[in-house]
Amino acid sequence: MIKYAEIHKIKIENEIRYIAKVYIDREEIEDKSFSSSTFEETAKYILKDCVISNYLDMTEMEE
């Protein structure tokens, strides 16, 4: 069984955050989500047991 993760770059109150959402067979696993202020830290945490499938920069959509 392969776990996939999407990393979302978002802006909350003028602070950039990277949020990883983990999925198995298209169902999100809420207790496996992770948030950090850097992409590298988020990716390092997620790559322990997941494949990163998508990166979505939500800050570009806000502008």
Regions found by a protein language model. Give the residues of each.
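Short acidic DE-rich linear segments
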Residues: 4, 59-63
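Short N-terminal "domain-start" leader segments
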Residues: 1-19
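A short, charged, amphipathic alpha-helix used as a generic interaction element across diverse proteins
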Residues: 27, 34-57
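A short, structured beta-strand/loop element
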Residues: 14-32
